Amino acid sequence: IFKIKAVQLAEKLLPAFNTPTGIPWAMVNLKSGVGRNWGWASAGSSILAEFGTLHMEFMHLSYLTGDLIYYKKVMHIRKLLQKMDRPNGLYPNYLNPRTGRWGQYHTSVGGLGDSFYEYLLKAWLMSDKTDHEARKMYDDAIEAIEKHLIKKSRGGKKEVLANKLKWFILLSYFFCHVTALKLGPESFKFDGAVEAVAVRQAEKYYILRPEVIETYWYLWRFTHDPRYRQWGWEAALAIEKYCRVSGGFSGVKDVYSSTPTHDDVQQSFFLAETLKYLYLLFSGDDLLPLEHWVFNTEAHPLPVLHLSNTTLSGNPAVR
């Protein structure tokens, strides 16, 4: 029944791809099939982190159903992006689905762009490391990120010009521990001699985000260094102490305040990701082993498509 429902939903989403370029609209009316983009997006553009974060789900749906249309839609996006000019070797965050031109040349591995790069690596992993095209696109992007988006503070710490980059976890742990609540702010900057702090009031909130805990889990699985479990436990205690409310959990408005104010919102990713990654961090490696499972950007596990895997009902042609 879940596969049937997934196919029904995917069929309702396919009209979003009916653009001159094949780059989908950000939104589609499920009844009429009419698509549109966010009004605030530059020059009527679609957003890299949205149209570039479909590969895993559509690839898996083609595998399960034997219908190549979903696979072809996402591969078309990849082929088009490969032909585009890339300033500094990176992909700008806005692409006009009518003209096939970049809406502007702003690049980032924070919001609007982050999960596109994530999915390049995960597409390779999901393919049992046979999708060499995705891996090359990822490697080339990482080289450009290291060259153009990383700088050092006066104290020698590295900062990436983004608010959610998962790779620099030591820095993430640092900025969590300089706050009153031991929870990290939404974003941080290096300002003069000050290291890794949220400068503006609008950056000081924590809304139960999972990215740092997600990274603790990956690093625990890769290294089994106990400090990652220790840091995860500290995060769990801080969330329990400062974010639990009578009806669940809430974000806080200022992680630097010892008497935080709640925002009265429990984000959906708190259950889907934050708590799931905390649970996995303290579970054995035999629970969702990484050689068999890849997590999409919202922490839903999808199986690695091993050629020898006979437990799935996929179409051999898709494999």
Which residue stretches match the model-derived regions?
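Glycan-recognition and catalytic cores of secretory/periplasmic carbohydrate-active enzymes
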Residues: I1-R319
